[in-house]
């Protein structure tokens, strides 16, 4: 409820103005003031009566809501307008629709409605109390105005006397003035001088610390640059690829092998033939030196040369090597070669946005170290396992020509679909045994099929091959190159299988029926020896 407004006389003139003349209090103004105050009192009384009626209505409603849920239905007279009624029935006695305000309604029970009524009754009582206070205040004012009017009527006009009071003390403090926008604060000169000296000393210290920090960072950057320039300690993909050291070791092994061959001029053909990896490497180096080609050979070329030399030894018993070196009596030097399957480098997709890449240089270096020892049937080297990811490099399945990691490395797979070095047929030991069996078969077929050549004719050729001058000056090769074709259909080239740590898919070629029958009848030396041991 708004408090009633009362008109008050205007404020007197400021003290600085000169003292005005005496202003008499007029009787009509006093009578008007009394009338306005009486209007306020009357208005308060009317409003108090209204709110008392509302309070009585809420009391009756509370009593009705408290007894309404006692019955399920009531017979009542339903009003139709202010004068028409119709008999009806009141049902759902425990459901009450409450007006929340602004035409919003909510359903509640009778007990909840009683709580709302009590809350609204408190608001009504508070409003009535406020109105009573206002009415009492204005009633006192009305009494004062009546007394004032009686005094003015009896004694005539009442004069209002006003006097100007001067202050004896001076206000020394300065009033605060609002600063202009974007203005700088003003300070005293002494304060500025002190701050300037402190700031200069602090700036010097900060500059020294900053330059010292910059010099330290430059030294660290230089050290990091020197470390990055060294290739020996580079770490990539979780594997330390010490390529320079491995290349040096490979060169040392190759040079040592060449010196051993050049120093030993004694015939040792059987020993050289038994150590196939070593002989293959030396033969490839001899071919390069005699033909005069000093070009760079990659690791893949070395592997191809090894396979070519093995095929030539198996099929022709050293004749092709003799002709390739150009030591024939009156014949043009000829190189016989055959295409081999290049081993495929494998990238294994683990399925979690990661790809395992094999270090080719590292594997080639390990293979060359193994070949330099001269043992063709050495123990199989297991891949180094440093992290859990290295385990899955050795356990891979082939599905539709693609490498898929195993869900569990403990489960076994068929040998056709597995590329694991432990379970598949492409392990190094089995490959060496199988290659040895093929070599023995080829030697037996060569001795049986070549009727025009005898053992006496092969011995001088072997002696000539052993007594070759290894330190021949390099010359350009001017002979012919002929692609070699396999004579016997029973002999299938061995599949090119890489290191067990670098799995490949061995190519499976169909074998003719005739070849299967012939190989079923013939027995190799190794198999015969095993049968004798079993017996």
From Swiss-Prot:
Keywords: Acetylation, Cell projection, Cytoplasm, Mitochondrion, Nucleus, Oncogene, Phosphoprotein, Protein phosphatase inhibitor, Repressor, Transcription, Transcription regulation
Major location category of this protein: nucleus
Modified sites of kind Phosphoserine: 372, 442
Tissue-level expression: Ubiquitous. Expressed in ovarian cancers (at protein level). Expressed strongly in skeletal muscle. Expressed weakly in brain, heart, pancreas and in prostate epithelial cells.
GO CC entries: cytoplasm; cytosol; dendrite; mitochondrion; nucleoplasm; nucleus; protein folding chaperone complex; RPAP3/R2TP/prefoldin-like complex
Lineage top rank: taxon: Eukaryota
Record-annotated disulphide pairs: none
Compositionally skewed regions (Polar residues) per UniProt: 253-265, 276-296, 417-427
Record's compositionally biased regions (Pro residues): 7-18
PTM entry text: Phosphorylated. Phosphorylation occurs essentially on serine residues. Phosphorylation occurs in response to androgen treatment in prostate cancer cells in a mTOR-dependent manner. Phosphorylated; hyperhosphorylated in mitochondria in a mTORC-dependent signaling pathway. Phosphorylated at Ser-372 by RPS6KB1 in a growth factor- and rapamycin-dependent manner.
Residues covered by region (Disordered): 1-23, 223-330, 352-383, 412-431
TM helices/strands, residue ranges: none
One of the record's GO molecular function terms: chromatin binding
Compartments, record wording: Nucleus; Cytoplasm; Mitochondrion; Cell projection, Dendrite
Name of one Pfam family that matches: Prefoldin
Phosphothreonine, modified sites: 373
GO biological process: cellular response to growth factor stimulus; cellular response to steroid hormone stimulus; intrinsic apoptotic signaling pathway in response to DNA damage by p53 class mediator; negative regulation of intrinsic apoptotic signaling pathway; negative regulation of phosphatase activity; negative regulation of transcription by RNA polymerase II; protein stabilization; regulation of cell growth
Family, per entry: Belongs to the RNA polymerase II subunit 5-mediating protein family.
Stated role: Involved in gene transcription regulation. Acts as a transcriptional repressor in concert with the corepressor UXT to regulate androgen receptor (AR) transcription. May act as a tumor suppressor to repress AR-mediated gene transcription and to inhibit anchorage-independent growth in prostate cancer cells. Required for cell survival in ovarian cancer cells. Together with UXT, associates with chromatin to the NKX3-1 promoter region. Antagonizes transcriptional modulation via hepatitis B virus X protein. Plays a central role in maintaining S6K1 signaling and BAD phosphorylation under normal growth conditions thereby protecting cells from potential deleterious effects of sustained S6K1 signaling. The URI1-PPP1CC complex acts as a central component of a negative feedback mechanism that counteracts excessive S6K1 survival signaling to BAD in response to growth factors. Mediates inhibition of PPP1CC phosphatase activity in mitochondria. Coordinates the regulation of nutrient-sensitive gene expression availability in a mTOR-dependent manner.
Subunit field text: Homodimer. Component of the PAQosome complex which is responsible for the biogenesis of several protein complexes and which consists of R2TP complex members RUVBL1, RUVBL2, RPAP3 and PIH1D1, URI complex members PFDN2, PFDN6, PDRG1, UXT and URI1 as well as ASDURF, POLR2E and DNAAF10/WDR92. Interacts with POLR2E/RPB5, RUVBL2 and RUVBL1. Interacts with PFDN2, PFDN4 and STAP1; the interactions are phosphorylation-dependent and occur in a growth-dependent manner in the mitochondrion. Interacts with UXT.
Name of the featured protein: Unconventional prefoldin RPB5 interactor 1
Gene for this chain: URI1
């Amino acid at each position: 409820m708004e408090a009633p407004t009362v008109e008050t006389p205007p404020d007197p003139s400021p003290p600085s103005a000169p003292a005005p003349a005496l202003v008499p209090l007029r009787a009509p103004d006093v009578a008007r003031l009394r009338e306005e105050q009486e209007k306020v009192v009357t208005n308060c009384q009317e409003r108090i009566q209204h709110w008392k009626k509302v309070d009585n209505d809420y009391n009756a409603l509370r009593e009705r809501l408290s007894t309404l849920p006692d019955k399920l239905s009531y017979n009542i007279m339903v009003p139709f307008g202010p004068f028409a009624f119709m008999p009806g029935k009141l049902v759902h006695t425990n459901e009450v629709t409450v007006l929340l305000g602004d035409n919003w309604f909510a359903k509640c029970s009778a007990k909840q409605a009683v709580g709302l009524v009590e809350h609204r009754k408190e608001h009504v009582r508070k409003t009535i109390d406020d109105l009573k206070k206002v009415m009492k205040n204005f009633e006192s004012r009305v009494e004062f105005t009546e007394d004032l009017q009686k005094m003015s009527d009896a004694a005539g006009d009442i004069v209002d006397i006003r006097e100007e009071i001067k202050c004896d003390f001076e206000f020394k403090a300065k009033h605060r003035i609002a600063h202009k926008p974007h203005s700088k604060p003003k300070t005293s000169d002494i304060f500025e001088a002190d701050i300037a000296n402190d700031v200069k000393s602090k700036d010097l210290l900060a500059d020294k610390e900053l330059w010292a920090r910059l010099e330290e960072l430059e030294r660290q950057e230089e050290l990091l640059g020197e470390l990055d320039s060294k290739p020996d300690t580079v770490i990539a993909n979780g594997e330390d690829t010490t390529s320079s050291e491995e290349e040096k070791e490979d060169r040392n092994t190759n040079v040592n092998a060449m010196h051993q061959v050049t120093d030993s001029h004694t015939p040792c053909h059987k020993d050289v033939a038994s150590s196939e990896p070593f002989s293959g490497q030396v033969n490839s180096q001899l071919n390069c030196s005699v033909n005069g080609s000093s070009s760079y050979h990659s690791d893949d070329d070395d592997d191809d040369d090894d396979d070519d030399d093995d095929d030539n030894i198996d099929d022709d018993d050293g004749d092709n090597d003799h002709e390739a070196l150009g030591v024939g009596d009156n014949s043009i030097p000829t190189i016989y070669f055959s295409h081999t399957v290049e081993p495929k480098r494998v990238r294994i997709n683990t399925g979690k946005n990661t790809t395992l890449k094999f270090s080719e240089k590292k594997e080639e270096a390990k293979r060359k170290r193994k070949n330099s020892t001269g043992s063709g049937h050495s123990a199989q080297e297991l891949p180094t396992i440093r992290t859990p990811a290295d385990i899955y490099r050795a356990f891979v399945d082939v599905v539709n020509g693609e490498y898929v990691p195993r869900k569990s490395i403990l489960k076994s797979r068929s040998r056709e679909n597995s590329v694991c070095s432990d379970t598949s047929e492409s392990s190094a030991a089995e490959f060496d045994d199988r290659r040895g069996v093929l070599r023995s078969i080829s030697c037996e077929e060569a001795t049986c099929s070549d009727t025009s050549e005898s053992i006496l004719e092969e011995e001088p050729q072997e002696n000539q091959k052993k007594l070759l001058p290894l330190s021949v000056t390099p010359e350009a090769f001017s002979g012919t190159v002929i692609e070699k074709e396999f004579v016997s259909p029973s002999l299938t080239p061995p599949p090119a299988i890489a290191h067990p740590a670098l799995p490949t898919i061995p190519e499976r070629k169909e074998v003719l029926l005739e070849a299967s029958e012939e190989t079923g009848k013939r027995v190799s030396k190794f198999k015969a020896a095993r049968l004798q041991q079993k017996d």
